[in-house]
Amino acid sequence: ILFCAHIPFRGGANSGGASVNKDKNYAEILKLLTEFHEAHIMVGHTHYPQNWIHSSYVTKGGTPVYEHVHGAACGAWWSCNMNVNGAPNCYSLYEIEGNSIKNWVTKGTKNEVGYQMRVYNGSQIYGGTDGTPSGKYRYTWYDGGKGGTANITAKGNSNLKGSFVAAIWNDDDKNWKVEFFQNGQKVGDMKRVPSKVPDICVVSYYFNNLGKNTTTWTTTTAQHYWYIEAPGGDPTKVKNWEVRATQTIPTSGEVNVYSCTDLQTDYSGF
């Protein structure tokens, strides 16, 4: 079954915000969905993509109810080529076989299907007097930063200094494996960033280049970030590296592999 709605279920009645109807029967609907062999919730509203697994609600086929929060084709309300969290303006493609979703992908509106991530230098400085690209407000992955006339805070994480940071916008925390390779040999597994952070490069673009001035542009609700310490501690000096992300579709076992071998160091494509 595909259950389509507008506002996400993922926080249910516990979510804040004026858009949430706390009298709606979120839990009751989730329970009803478990009576089917497979269940997917298709929603939008957020202007960023996010996958959410309802682990407490398992279907007759043995897989949890899976919620697909779709990013917007118009992105951040046509202000650039991105959704508010840095994912490209996008839509999703689904391959259905019989009574099951065999495969799916989130596709950027101006990108090839294989474009599924950006990889950053966790030590890079954006904006400020010492940052590249330049700008009024200074941001780093490890310290965060503040910007706009409202002094909006963007959170950082100290673990990210000296690390490769991958933003993978169609990921989830159960069905993806992200690995780091050098010279064709695996160095290690990348880990989820242990605290909520935004895409710092994207935040700098929004505040320094587009003049944004609200917390919408520092969103940390959807976490798509993985990291690993760079060999030698400086990502810019590492040669012949690759971040490889492997997605296993939970309902079919289908496997998708995506790769990135270049650092995103500026706002190109934004």
Language-model features, listed with the residues they occupy:
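His/acidic metal-ligating clusters that form di-metal
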Residues: 1-66
